[in-house]
């Protein structure tokens, strides 16, 4: 799976197992270059994360319902949604609430 944002192809990694959902981006040292997708998830935390991220929350139809740029470490975000995307910094600048997030397989 991938998406195109600002003419860049970005790989989407669906987190489907309990372990992958629990770990998410915690303890990652290398810069984040992919989008990590949590299904049936409307809250995240950034505890134990070593870098800031952008967050996008979608409804079941992939409509963007919430965007937050530059989420710092040790924060909790709780918003109503179906999918939560943890994204590289700067990704939110090209997106708008109300738009549909395009996912290609």
Where are the model-predicted features located?
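Compact, glycine-rich, soluble single-domain proteins
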Residues: 1-105
């Amino acid at each position: 799976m991938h998406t195109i944002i600002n003419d860049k192809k970005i790989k989407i990694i669906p987190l489907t197992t309990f372990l992958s959902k629990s770990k998410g981006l915690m303890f990652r040292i290398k810069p984040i270059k992919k989008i990590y997708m949590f299904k049936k998830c409307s809250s995240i935390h950034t505890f134990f994360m070593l870098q800031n991220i952008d967050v996008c929350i979608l409804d079941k139809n992939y409509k963007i319902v919430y965007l937050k740029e530059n989420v710092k470490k040790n924060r909790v975000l709780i918003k109503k949604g179906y999918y939560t995307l943890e994204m590289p910094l700067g990704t939110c600048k090209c997106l708008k609430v109300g738009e549909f997030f395009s996912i290609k397989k």
